[in-house]
């Protein structure tokens, strides 16, 4: 692996705040230690700290620990199904950045985001404070090229949450930062991609794969211990220095007969513990790779819905890939010849599925129309609203699909907006990214207006 040190002319990024909040259980324990109620309170298990937990215990019956051991997984599944209908939105102000394409939780308060205007920043969801992160610059000057409108499309944390992968100042390069400090570690700008990076996935703590608009996937290996010997802070001016690396392997996806000019790699997802990698290309194909010291393609299959395949996720519990397209989500179970899970239709006016995530058997769908939908893959139906008590009848409550509508966000009232959209005051935001903080039951959602010429952003915390 070739390495070289380079000094960045940008300031050191502010360190991410440590998550030092005390847990609710510690507060309860302290309260229980006062007065003569100690013995009585000890009889109640300390695990019942929420109404959802209490209701589920009452439903299955009994308080004995022997009966609790068998339904811990059932309780989690119950919480996953009930959480969406309990969420309420609080919008976050992001200033004038254009369209948030990617996001990830760093800790219980901070989310890192990447935008179409090539801005990388951390937002504190409690205080609203925003800190920009300097982008890493290539070691050699590149030929002048128009990079307007490219942006940061991917942000991924490795399994141990010690490294963060995203795009560099040149969107063709892969930037790696250390966590929690967000100090730069290395930049993959040598013999890698020749066009923008659209997707990143971690196969392990030190191995990442990137997918590009040039139709290639690249395998990168990071060795922080090795970099410690070569990466240091400049002793005189305190500028960050980072290594420059090249990929271990670069492979091109096969060129399709139907649409050979549109084989851009749009999304990646790591497929469980088998070192397998799923990839979706804009020509309407799904590709499966085996990753070791190099990449080996296992198969390529035509997707049933092949317009705007822009997002991909994997469900560990069910060993299923989900692909978002123009108006559907398709499910791929590669263990079976026949697909037993039928595709779901988002029915959001053909604005497309823009973001997907799995948690257990529930998939969250972010649409181009500013809506969040929730689908139970096992039951093969959308989660439904619970009707109010006044609407219930003897035949049971009326149900309809649970749909969370996101707020207006911010929109730049420029000439494009006036000339092409007649000065529409309300314009739905495409939800390009969302990420859960499950321990605290929080959901971060972000995006911006769908038309390419419109400039704006949306971010919201649902809790």
Curated annotation (Swiss-Prot):
Protein name stated in the entry: DDB1- and CUL4-associated factor 12-like protein 1
What Pfam family is a match, any one?
Beta-prop_DCAF12
One GO CC term, this protein: Cul4-RING E3 ubiquitin ligase complex
Reply yes or no: does the keyword Isomerase apply. Answer: no
Q: Does the keyword Ribosomal protein apply?
A: no
Question: Where are this protein's WD repeats?
Answer: 87-137, 138-184, 185-252, 253-297, 298-341, 342-376
Keywords, A to Z?
Answer: Repeat, WD repeat
Regarding protein family, the annotation reads: Belongs to the WD repeat DCAF12 family.
Fetch the PROSITE patterns from UniProt: WD_REPEATS_2, WD_REPEATS_REGION
The record's section on InterPro entries has: Beta-prop_DCAF12, DCAF12, WD40/YVTN_repeat-like_dom_sf, WD40_repeat_dom_sf, WD40_rpt
Report the domain of life of the source organism.
Answer: Eukaryota
Q: Where is this region: Disordered?
A: 1-35
Q: Which Gene3D superfamilies match?
A: YVTN repeat-like/Quinoprotein amine dehydrogenase (2.130.10.10)
């Amino acid at each position: 692996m070739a390495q070289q040190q380079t000094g960045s002319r940008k300031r050191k990024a502010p360190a991410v705040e440590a998550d030092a909040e005390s847990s609710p259980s510690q507060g309860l324990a302290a309260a229980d230690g006062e007065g003569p109620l100690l013995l009585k309170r000890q009889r109640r298990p300390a695990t019942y700290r929420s109404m959802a937990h209490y209701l589920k215990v009452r439903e299955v019956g009994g308080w004995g620990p022997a009966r609790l051991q068998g339904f811990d997984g059932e309780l989690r599944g119950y919480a996953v199904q009930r959480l969406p209908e309990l969420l309420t939105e609080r919008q976050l102000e992001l200033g004038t950045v254009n369209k948030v394409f990617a996001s990830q939780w760093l800790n219980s308060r901070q989310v890192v985001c990447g935008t179409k205007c090539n801005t990388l920043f951390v937002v504190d969801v409690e205080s609203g404070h925003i800190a920009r992160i300097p982008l890493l610059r290539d070691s050699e000057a590149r030929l002048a090229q128009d990079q307007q409108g490219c942006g940061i499309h991917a942000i991924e944390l490795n399994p141990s949450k010690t490294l963060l992968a995203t795009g560099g100042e040149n969107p063709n390069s892969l930037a790696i930062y250390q966590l929690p400090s967000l100090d730069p570690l290395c930049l993959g700008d040598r013999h890698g991609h020749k066009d923008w990076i659209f997707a990143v996935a971690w196969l392990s703590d030190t191995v990442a794969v990137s997918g590009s608009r040039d139709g290639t996937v690249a395998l990168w290996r990071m060795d922080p211990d090795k970099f410690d010997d070569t990466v240091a802070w400049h002793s005189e001016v305190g500028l960050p220095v980072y290594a420059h690396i090249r990929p271990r392997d670069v492979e091109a996806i096969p060129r399709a007969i139907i649409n050979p000019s549109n084989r851009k790699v749009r999304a990646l997802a790591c497929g469980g513990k088998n070192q397998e990698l799923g990839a979706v290309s804009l020509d309407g194909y799904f590709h499966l790779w085996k990753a070791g010291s190099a990449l080996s393609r296992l198969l390529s299959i035509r997707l049933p819905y092949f317009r705007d395949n822009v997002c991909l996720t994997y469900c560990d519990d069910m060993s299923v890939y989900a692909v978002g397209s123009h108006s559907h989500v398709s499910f791929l179970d590669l263990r079976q010849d026949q697909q037993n899970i039928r595709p779901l239709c988002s029915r959001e006016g053909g604005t497309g599925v823009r973001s997907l995530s799995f948690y257990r058997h529930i998939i969250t769908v972010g649409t181009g129309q500013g809506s969040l939908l929730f689908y139970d893959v096992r039951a093969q139906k959308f989660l439904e609203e619970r009707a109010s008590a006044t609407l219930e009848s003897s035949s049971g409550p009326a149900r309809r699909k649970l749909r969370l509508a996101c707020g207006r966000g911010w929109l730049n009232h420029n000439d494009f907006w006036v000339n092409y959209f007649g000065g529409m005051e309300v314009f739905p935001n495409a939800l390009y990214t969302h990420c859960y903080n499950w321990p605290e039951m929080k959901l971060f959602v972000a995006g911006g207006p769908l038309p390419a010429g419109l400039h704006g952003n949306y971010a919201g915390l649902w809790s």
